Amino acid sequence: IDKALSDSAVDYLAVIFDKAEKTFRNEIYPDYKAHRPDAPEELVPQFPMVREATRAMGLPCLELDDYEADDIIASYAMAASRAGIAVTVVSSDKDLMQLVGASADGVKIEMYDPMKDKPIGPAEVMEKFGVGPEKVVDVQALAGDSVDNVPGVPGIGVKTAAELINTYGDLETLLAHAGEIKQPKRRETL
C-alpha cells in the first residue's frame, strides 16, 4: 500500500478483501474451494487489524457478502476503465490475469505482482497459460483449477487446453468441432 500511495500517478486506490464466508460459487458448485486449508491460526486475528489499518490510512476497504475479492476487483477495474481511468490491479492472483490488457474506451487494465515486484503483461500471461489474457477463462474451463477445487476435463491440463484454444479460437468453437479432434480419447472426452 505504501508503494502505491507513494506513486504520484495514483489518483484512486481501494483495498479489497475476501469475506470468510461462502460465495455464490458454492451454491453453483458446493465443492468449490472445499479442500483449501484454513488460514494459519496466527494470521486470522490479523485480518481485522489490517482492515482497521487500511481505514486509518483513509483508504476505502471493500468486501461484499457472497462475492470474492476477485469479483469486486474485476467489476471495479472494468467500471473504472469504462470511465476512462487507468487501472493497475495489484495482485499475484492468477485468476485476475484475464483482466490484463482489457480495455474499455481505450484505457487498458494493467496488473502488478507485488510478490515478485514486477508488472504482469500479456507476455507473462502467455507464458503462464499459453494464451492471451482474453482466453484465460477458456483454458481454465478446460484445465480446471486444483487450488479452487474446480474440476476440468479429465486428461486436459493447461498446456493441452492452451493448444486446443489456440487451434480452435475459443471454447465454444472447440466444443462445436470436438468431433474433428484427432486424438480419440480427447475427442470422446470433449
Identify the role of each PLM range.
Residues 1-14, 18, 24-27, 31:
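Non-catalytic, usually N-terminal nucleic-acid engagement modules in DNA/RNA processing proteins
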Residues 34-190:
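Extended two-metal-dependent nuclease catalytic cores across DNA- and RNA-processing enzymes
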Residues 21-25, 95-98:
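Short, active-site-adjacent cap segments at secondary-structure transitions
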